[in-house]
Amino acid sequence: MQTGYQAVIDRYYPHDNELRHILITHSRSVADLALALAKRLPELCLDLQFVEEAAMLHDIGIVRCDAPSIHCFGTEPYIAHGRQGAEMLRAEGMPRHARVCERHTGAGITREAIETQHLPLPLQDFLPETLEEQLICYADKFFSKTKLDRQKTVEQAEKSLAKFGEDGLVRFRAWVKRFGEPPMVLAAK
């Protein structure tokens, strides 16, 4: 039996190709880490089924984006993959999952950053708000779509985020305190 998230992935990524492989491998790593962190923190009462589903779908919008290095040959700028995914999931009747899509980029994107950097996004805050949104965004920072077999350390994740500004680093460091150092869910290489 197919899971709900798998049916959505199959609808938008019907062919067994490199992009589908990248999406599923990356998303599974994010989901596994998010679930491992959530299970260590039962006092947070996180919705584990939702965490898994939303983590598996958080990057669904990459198919619409132009990022040839990861086999994405759409027309939208990559920075918009969260918004594109949110649009797709809202059309699927998944508004809660859509919020994860549109709020996971970087450590969230502020209205101010969109305005000052002239990003091709609506002028509003796209910051993770719920604990589940924050957890999935946090877990995502430890994996890239170009090195699928590697899990970043906290220091490596911070270095990746640093180029986008101090406010994202502040949010990320707060998540390190809230959710803890991540366990290795992939063998370090």
Residue ranges of model-derived segments:
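A general alpha-helix detector
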Residues: 8-11, 33, 84-85, 138, ...
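Exposed alpha-helical structural elements
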Residues: 4-11, 50, 96, 100, ...
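Charge-dense, low-complexity intrinsically disordered segments
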Residues: 17, 21-24, 129, 163-166
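Charged phosphate-binding loop/patch that engages nucleotide di/tri-phosphates or the phosphate backbone
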Residues: 161-189
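Divalent metal-dependent catalytic cores for phosphoryl transfer on phosphate-bearing substrates
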Residues: 43-150, 154
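Short N-terminal secondary-structure initiator segments
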Residues: 1-14, 80-103, 181-189
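Acidic/His-rich, divalent-metal-binding segments that scaffold phosphate/diphosphate chemistry
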Residues: 1-78
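Generic structural signal for well-ordered, non-transmembrane alpha-helical segments
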Residues: 28, 32, 95, 177-180
